[in-house]
Structures are given as structure tokens and as C-alpha cells.
Amino acid sequence: MGSMSIWHWVIVAVIVMLLFGRGKVSDLMGDVAKGIKAFKKGMAEDETPPAVQAAPPPAEPVRTIPHATETSPGTAIPASHLPGGERKPV
């Protein structure tokens, strides 16, 4: 049961021709060729860069919301927020 010889492929081709008929096989091969051509055309269109790109929409300004736990530099953090209850400058 090694590789398939040429005679195996000939027998398979004859069986396919008997099952599907000559007309269906040629139609199928034509459809495959059309699909390959359409694929190549699509790939060629993707390679060409677009001539004019649309401007990106203007960005909305970012709003920041300060947290209630933020402190300004030089202020102490409440003892309830520190482990051990110590007060340390920030």
C-alpha cells in the first residue's frame, strides 16, 4: 500500500467521469478557473493604495474626574487609609 501509481489515478479519473459526466466536470473546472481569476483580481486591487484617504473624525476632548482619595503634593494621607494608623506626607 505504497504511493498511488499513475494507473490508480487513471481509474479514479474514469470513475469520476462516469459518475458526473463530461459536461458537469468541465463546468466544475470552469467555475474553479473563474474563482481563481476573481481571487487574483481581488488580490491585485488590494495592493494598490487608495488615492485619497478620508480625514479621521475629530477626537472628543478627554474629561478627567478626580477621585475623592487624591491629595495634592505635601498633604498628609488620613490615618484611616494607612496600615498601622501612621500619618506620612505624600
Curated annotation (Swiss-Prot):
Q: Where is this region: Disordered?
A: 44-90
One term under GO cellular component: TAT protein transport complex
Could you say which protein family the record assigns here?
A: Belongs to the TatA/E family.
Name under which the protein is recorded: Sec-independent protein translocase protein TatA
Q: What compartments host this protein?
A: Cell inner membrane
Which key words tag this protein in UniProt? Answer: Cell inner membrane, Cell membrane, Membrane, Protein transport, Translocation, Transmembrane, Transmembrane helix, Transport
UniProt keyword annotation of Cell inner membrane present: yes
Extract one GO molecular function annotation from the record.
Answer: protein transmembrane transporter activity
Give the species this sequence originates from. Answer: Methylobacterium radiotolerans (strain ATCC 27329 / DSM 1819 / JCM 2831 / NBRC 15690 / NCIMB 10815 / 0-1)
Q: What is its main location?
A: membrane
Quaternary structure, per UniProt, is: The Tat system comprises two distinct complexes: a TatABC complex, containing multiple copies of TatA, TatB and TatC subunits, and a separate TatA complex, containing only TatA subunits. Substrates initially bind to the TatABC complex, which probably triggers association of the separate TatA complex to form the active translocon.
Entries under NCBIfam families matching the protein: PRK00720.1, tatAE
